């Protein structure tokens, strides 16, 4: 592995926890993880191949984009039934549902090895996004959508001290979570070490790094680490990164939110990778 000057962290550690597959766990108010809220999210769910038990349509809302959802449900043999707003609110656990919700089989997290296998099956160098302790469901949902649209092979999130893939995240991703692999790991540092063992370059996106557009993302695998809204990338993951990259700011505001920052950097990586 040779490249320009880089930061290297401590010794690699290997763990088996990111090879497990396990169902998403959510609160009872979120219908034990099987409630999906919002028109785009439900439509993407129907197109994903995941098992769908039933679609609920708010009474009187069968018009506009809802007719497309009902037609798609009919093609898949999924019943679409009317329900009052109270039932929808209860099913969705307070998430805005736009008059449409679904009951589906639980989404499953994949392992880190599965994401690497996806890249291998596509004949591509790994392209991964690592979410370091992001707590806002809207930011995580938007980050997942950006990663999916940029062609990333998967996104990695921690099991603790971070938002999980809840109905709010699914809705904020506009259903993109149905089309990208999400790995949940016990130890992000160990996951980073595993990626480095697989010759994946680690880029931490921070305010004080080198301009991202000066980097070559086209040679070899790459993983982009994005930190939480208030704290940024943790010291441990920053120290393990090969490169620290930044988005130069030219206006009166000093930063972008995490999903916007991710979009800027990972779409540049996608551009370079598809030259």
PLM segments and residue spans:
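Structured adenosyl-cofactor binding patch, chiefly the S-adenosyl-L-methionine
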Residues: 43, 48-49, 149, 170-176, ...
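Short, acidic/turn-prone active-site loops that include or flank metal/cofactor-
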Residues: 60-62, 86, 160-162, 229-231, ...
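Active-site/ligand-binding-proximal alpha/beta "capping" segment
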Residues: 203-257
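Short, glycine/polar-rich helix-capping loops at beta-to-alpha or helix-loop-helix junctions
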Residues: 66, 162-168, 231-240
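RNA substrate-binding interface of SAM-dependent RNA methyltransferases
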Residues: 47-50, 120-210, 214
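N-terminal positively charged helical leader segments and presequences
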Residues: 1-118
